Each structure stands twice: as C-alpha cells, then as structure tokens.
Amino acid sequence: SGVGDGVDVVSAIEGAAGPIAAIGGAVLTVMVGIKVYKWVRRAM
C-alpha cells in the first residue's frame, strides 16, 4: 500500500487539474470580460 496509494492520489489530482484549470480560466475570462464591457459602455 503506502507509496502506491500516494502515487494514485497524485495522478488523480493531476488528471483533474487540467479541466479544473480550464474551467477556472474560462470563468475568470468571462468575469473580466463583463467588467471591461460595463466599463467601456459607461465610458462611451
């Protein structure tokens, strides 16, 4: 057990990190886009 279990957990986290990072990045991009859009609309 010991070492093998640790490796499985790490590989599972690394496997999940990609999609989570992609979703997080998309959400962040949308939020920034909305802020910029509102700011530009108010400036015009």
From Swiss-Prot:
It comes from the Viruses. Keywords: Acetylation, Capsid protein, Helical capsid protein, Host membrane, Membrane, Transmembrane, Transmembrane helix, Virion. It holds the Pfam family Phage_Coat_B. One of its GO terms (cellular component) is membrane. It is a single-pass membrane protein. The keyword Transmembrane applies. The modification N-acetylserine is found at S1. This is Capsid protein G8P.
